[in-house]
Amino acid sequence: LLYELTTLAQEDLKDIARYTLTQWSENQSLHYAELLEKRFCEIAERTAYSRTLSSRYPQVLVNRCEHHYIFYIHQEKKPPRIIAILHERMNMLKRLKNRFD
């Protein structure tokens, strides 16, 4: 297991796939899913450039992939835990509040 997706992050991915399929096409939806998957692997390999979300949550890192931000936590001796994949136009802090458990 290279990385772990929380239940809510899995829901984010499903929402992204549905939206992209509806607004664009199946090919675009598959392409975007591949881009996100590649970025998840880069996060797991620690080769993706990421920054700390804030001083209040120093354990939470954020990485941009196209029009989405991936929020995750690197765990000691465990795969990174991806807690959210949110669109750049969303109110991210509001949506992240319930994911810091």
Protein language model regions, located:
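Residue-level signal for well-ordered alpha-helical positions
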Residues: 16, 46, 95-96
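Arg/Lys-rich, positively charged N-terminal/basic patches that mediate binding to nucleic acids
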Residues: 1-35
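Conserved protein kinase catalytic domain
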Residues: 17, 37, 83-86
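Enriched for short, Lys/Arg-rich terminal
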Residues: 73-101
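Basic/aromatic recognition patch in beta-strand/loop cores that engages polyanionic ligands
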Residues: 38, 48-79
